[in-house]
């Protein structure tokens, strides 16, 4: 008899894409997949586009959003838990997988109240508030990076599920210093304003041949393209890169934020990187994500407070002339990557659906 999985993931690509990777793997094995999210975030379009039905609940974040929202939070949470329970009664999943996003909190509580096994996956090196709370209710807690939760019988490090086409990329190769440096700029699914503003001038000031592909985020393409044109730099600018595997394969160096999915894809792709973590990320989780590769010699760390035209230009110029260093960084990235994370998470879903408890796992 076919098993059913309910995936809870939304808000950003860092939550949605790993969930899709697991969903695709289980669907190929005969599972039925449903999704729980919110109607005003990216999962509302992205998940149906991948062929999965999605149900919505009404929920918003409560951290750092003012006293009125904080006071209204208990009512909203209770309402959203009841909505999630109705979804569970309709779908009757064998397992509920929480990948992060606003819907995960109420959905996780509803799963626990309904007696449905709850499996959590924490994508960041620092656990988010929702997963910290839900961990008490979950049968199993999976981590992308060590240290997000204390080691126990119920926890395991499995990596971040990344797109299979990224995992399938060949081993990194040394590029010739006589050729232009292939520079990929990735601001995450929502773009990164500081990269959009600083990189064009830095590329121009580097004083070395550089070819650029720049993912700028929705609504930013025209202004970023104009910034490159003003500096006399030819660049391929796009709001969203559909084929990230091709982009990583092309790149000698990536300059990017340090969201969980980006860090994991950089590692899986085997490409050198300069990480510029989002400075105001909750619990500074992007810095901790970045350090998992920086500490292994696979990437460089550039705090946003130190990011200037001159500082980035100097790094680009230095690395462009040291292709062996870039290759060593790329190889180190591939070495620390966990490339079968989607399979590991899918296997955990199957074990819970089969009735194995945390001690058996």
UniProtKB/Swiss-Prot annotation:
EC id: 2.4.1.227
Cell compartment(s), UniProt: Cell inner membrane
Binding site for UDP-N-acetyl-alpha-D-glucosamine: 12-14, 124, 163, 189, 241, 260-265, 286
Keyword Transferase tagged: yes
GO MF terms held by the record: UDP-N-acetyl-D-glucosamine:N-acetylmuramoyl-L-alanyl-D-glutamyl-meso-2,6-diaminopimelyl-D-alanyl-D-alanine-diphosphoundecaprenol 4-beta-N-acetylglucosaminlytransferase activity; undecaprenyldiphospho-muramoylpentapeptide beta-N-acetylglucosaminyltransferase activity
Keywords: Cell cycle, Cell division, Cell inner membrane, Cell membrane, Cell shape, Cell wall biogenesis/degradation, Glycosyltransferase, Membrane, Peptidoglycan synthesis, Transferase
Domain of life (superkingdom): Bacteria
UniProt topology in membrane: Peripheral membrane protein
Entry's Gene Ontology BP terms: carbohydrate metabolic process; cell division; cell wall organization; lipid glycosylation; peptidoglycan biosynthetic process; regulation of cell shape
Pathway stated in the Swiss-Prot or TrEMBL entry: Cell wall biogenesis; peptidoglycan biosynthesis
GO cellular component term of the entry, any: plasma membrane
Classification via Gene3D superfamilies: Glycogen Phosphorylase B (3.40.50.2000)
InterPro entries in the cross-refs: GlcNAc_MurG, Glyco_trans_28_C, GlycoTrans_28_N
Major location (coarse): membrane
SUPFAM superfamilies: UDP-Glycosyltransferase/glycogen phosphorylase
Keyword Glycosyltransferase: yes
Substrates-to-products reaction catalysed: di-trans,octa-cis-undecaprenyl diphospho-N-acetyl-alpha-D-muramoyl-L-alanyl-D-glutamyl-meso-2,6-diaminopimeloyl-D-alanyl-D-alanine + UDP-N-acetyl-alpha-D-glucosamine = di-trans,octa-cis-undecaprenyl diphospho-[N-acetyl-alpha-D-glucosaminyl-(1->4)]-N-acetyl-alpha-D-muramoyl-L-alanyl-D-glutamyl-meso-2,6-diaminopimeloyl-D-alanyl-D-alanine + UDP + H(+)
UniProt record similarity statement: Belongs to the glycosyltransferase 28 family. MurG subfamily.
Function: Cell wall formation. Catalyzes the transfer of a GlcNAc subunit on undecaprenyl-pyrophosphoryl-MurNAc-pentapeptide (lipid intermediate I) to form undecaprenyl-pyrophosphoryl-MurNAc-(pentapeptide)GlcNAc (lipid intermediate II).
Stored NCBIfam families: murG
The name this protein goes by in its record: UDP-N-acetylglucosamine--N-acetylmuramyl-(pentapeptide) pyrophosphoryl-undecaprenol N-acetylglucosamine transferase
Source organism: Aeromonas salmonicida (strain A449)
């Amino acid at each position: 008899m076919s098993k059913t999985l309910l995936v809870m993931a939304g808000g950003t690509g860092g939550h949605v894409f790993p969930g899709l990777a697991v969903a695709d793997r289980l669907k190929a094995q005969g599972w039925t997949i449903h999704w729980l999210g919110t109607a005003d975030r990216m999962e509302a379009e992205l998940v149906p586009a991948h062929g999965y039905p999605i149900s919505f609940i009404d929920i918003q974040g409560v951290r750092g959003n003012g006293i009125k929202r904080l006071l209204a939070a208990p009512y909203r949470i209770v309402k959203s838990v009841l909505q999630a329970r109705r979804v569970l009664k309709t779908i009757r999943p064998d397992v509920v997988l929480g990948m992060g996003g606003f819907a995960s909190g109420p959905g996780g509580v509803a799963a626990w109240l309904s007696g449905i096994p709850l499996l959590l996956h924490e994508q960041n090196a620092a656990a988010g508030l929702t997963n910290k709370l839900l961990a008490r209710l979950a049968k199993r807690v999976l981590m992308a990076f060590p240290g997000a939760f204390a080691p126990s019988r119920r926890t395991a490090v499995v990596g971040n599920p990344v797109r299979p086409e990224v995992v399938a990329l060949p081993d990194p190769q040394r590029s010739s210093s006589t050729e232009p440096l292939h520079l990929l700029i990735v601001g995450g699914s929502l773009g990164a304003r500081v990269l959009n503003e600083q990189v064009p001038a830095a590329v121009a000031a580097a004083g070395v041949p550089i070819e650029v592909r720049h993912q700028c985020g929705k609504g930013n393409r025209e202004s970023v393209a104009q910034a490159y044109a003003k500096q006399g730099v030819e660049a391929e600018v796009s709001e969203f890169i559909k084929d990230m595997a091709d982009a990583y394969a092309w790149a000698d160096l990536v300059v990017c934020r340090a969201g969980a999915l980006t860090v994991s894809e950089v590692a899986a792709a085997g490409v050198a990187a300069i990480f510029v973590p989002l400075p105001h990320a909750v619990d500074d989780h992007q810095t901790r994500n970045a350090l998992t590769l920086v500490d292994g010699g696979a990437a460089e760390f550039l705090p946003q407070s130190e990011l200037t035209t001159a500082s980035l230009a100097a790094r680009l110029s230095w690395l462009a002339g040291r292709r062996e260093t870039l290759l060593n960084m790329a190889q180190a990235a591939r070495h620390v990557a966990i490339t079968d994370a989607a399979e590991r998470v899918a296997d955990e879903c199957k074990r819970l659906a089969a009735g194995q408890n945390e001690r058996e796992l």
